[in-house]
Amino acid sequence: AASDVYKRQVHELTAESTPIEREFYEFYRTPRGEFTPDGATPRTTTHPTLTSNVKFMNFYPFADIETISPRPLLFIAGENAHSREFSENAYRLAAEPKELYLVPDAGHVDLYDRTGLIPFGKLETFFRAALK
């Protein structure tokens, strides 16, 4: 039988580790965000098979994004996030009313748990105005 093919996961950092690998390692492989369920080991918790991605092949999150209007949209991304371009693309494709907020000095995973960086004030202002 053929062996399963898994997405590459970083279990330890090396001199060749990319900035994205370092950022995700810092969250998912440290007490900051690592979770190992009973019966598993840390080395087996983040190994989705490549076939796990098939469900995304028929999903395009920007399809018909303009039809959300006239409901307001707030896109938030870290200014240093590798994923920032996705928020910028969504913002560009969305109809008004819309807003793009870049969090200064924040990367992608910083907005998971770094409460000093999460823009709670911006969220409150947006929801107070948008949920009238």
Task: For the regions a language model picked out, list residue spans one by one.
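Short, small-residue-biased leader/transition segments that mark boundaries at the very start
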Residues: 2-6
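Extended, charge-rich helix/loop segments that form flexible
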Residues: 10-41
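Active-site nucleophile elbow and catalytic-triad environment of alpha/beta-hydrolase enzymes
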Residues: 48-65
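Short, conserved loop/helix-junction motifs that constitute active-site signature segments
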Residues: 66-69, 93-95
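Short beta-strand/loop motif that positions the catalytic acidic residue
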Residues: 74-77
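Catalytic active-site module of serine/aspartate enzymes centered on a nucleophile-bearing elbow/loop
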Residues: 106-109, 113-132
